[in-house]
Every structure is written in C-alpha cells, then in structure tokens.
C-alpha cells in the first residue's frame, strides 16, 4: 500500500472516530468490533459514493441552470456576481475558497426558485461538503475548476443555457477527475 493511500485511510478513519492520534505517542484504535469494521468498509466505498453523488448532481444541475437562466432576477444575478468576484479574488490570492465555492453553488440552487429541487440538491451537497472538508489526500482540491465558476456566471448572466450547461459539465469533469485520482 502506498503512503498516500495509507495517509488517506488514516485521515478518514480518524475523522470517523475509529482512530485517535495522540501527539508524541502514536495512533490508537478508539473503537473495536463491528463498528470499526463498518467504518473500514465504508472507507473503501468512499470515493465511489462521492462519484455516484457527483453523477446525480450533474443531472440535477443541468436543469437547475436552465431554471436559473429563466427565473433569476437581475438583483439575484448581481448577488451571484458578488459571490463570484469574491471567489475569484480568493483564488487569485491563493487563499482557501471552499466556503465561498459552496456559497456560489448554493446561490445557484436557490435561484432556480424550485424548493423541492433545492432541497434535493442540498441534501446531496451534505455528502459532498463532508468530502470537501476532509478531502481524501487532496492537498488543494478542485483548484482547476475555480476559473470555470466565473465563466459559468457570465454564461448565466448572458442567459445562454447551452453555454452555461457546457461550462458546468467541464467544471464537474474537473472535480470528477480529481476525485478519481
């Protein structure tokens, strides 16, 4: 087993409470029996689960983008523009932008003006956010996708459904590629 794979496994098991790192002493198993085995089995499925959720997200976001283009007001698009500007500013300054990235997508979901769709996509986002917060051995995850957010915003602003959907596909392709590695 390679060191990065082992580090990845250790991180996940630690965040799930199966392992505990004690400075100067080592790493210890905190739970035994079935629970730690279930956690271990869940870890092996982690990336595939995230990829499955990403696939559903891809399907839903295609329709969400169409709805946003037809339903969002100018004022709402201005708000999305402010979030986009902040995201790009943090990106260009080399600062973490995970929370602003999440806000960007959440804003798009809200601008669909479809409560059922919003609740569905945000329930999927809960799974994705846990991955963003504890990326599986990814140092600076999804940086290649950040510039595409600005392009997506401009395509939405132009009310160009096909272009916006295409850019969003590229954005999700980048995310999928990094997860798959």
Give residue ranges: language-model regions.
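Structural signature of alpha-solenoid helical repeat scaffolds
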Residues: 137-140
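Short arginine-rich
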Residues: 173-181
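Short linear motifs at protein or domain termini
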Residues: 1-59, 66
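Conserved amphipathic alpha-helical segments that form helical-bundle/coiled-coil interaction surfaces
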Residues: 56-134, 144-150, 155, 163-174
